[in-house]
Amino acid sequence: MVELHDLQPHWGATKEKKRVGRGIGSGHGKTAGRGHKGQKSRSGDRKMPPYFEGGQTPLYMRIPKRGFKNPTRKEYTPVNVGVIDKLFEDGMEITPEVLASKGLCDEKDRVKILGDGELTKKFVIKAHAFSKSAKEKIEKAGGKWEIIS
């Protein structure tokens, strides 16, 4: 009867671990299969990252630097007046919180109103920025725009 302590893998399912550097009688002594000298024979040899070029100045350092990251940059979430016209009723006051409730932006986002689409309803729109065409369309429809900080 087979018991738990008698279980072992099927013959051929596992491979013996190759023990290298254990004397010449093993067949893998002396250099342990690493050959003579060179980077790959040394201890600590590992796969080099793809950008390593053998010690010569790497490509990313040979190419000149360009541009910079502006630490004071302000990013805006764009919302078009045509979208506002479709989603909201006439006479409403539109704020970033109202736009966020409809899923057009996050509540924390800075909002810029752009002038794509037609505006047929009157709105009071409060946002962080407006394009020139958006301002014109809001005023033409009889609405008002207001910049908030």
Swiss-Prot record:
Tell me, what is one Gene Ontology molecular-function annotation carried by this entry? rRNA binding
Is this entry keyworded Disulfide bond? no
Quote the InterPro entries the UniProt record gives: Ribosomal_uL15, Ribosomal_uL15/eL18, Ribosomal_uL15/eL18_sf, Ribosomal_uL15_bac-type, Ribosomal_uL15_CS
Question: What PROSITE patterns does the annotation carry?
Answer: RIBOSOMAL_L15
> Does RNA-binding show up as a keyword for this record?
yes
Q: Which GO terms describe its cellular component?
A: cytosolic large ribosomal subunit
The record ties this protein, via SUPFAM superfamilies, to:
Ribosomal proteins L15p and L18e (SSF52080)
**Oligomeric state and partners?**
Part of the 50S ribosomal subunit.
Q: What protein family is recorded?
A: Belongs to the universal ribosomal protein uL15 family.
Q: Which NCBIfam families match?
A: rplO_bact
The protein's name in its UniProt record: Large ribosomal subunit protein uL15
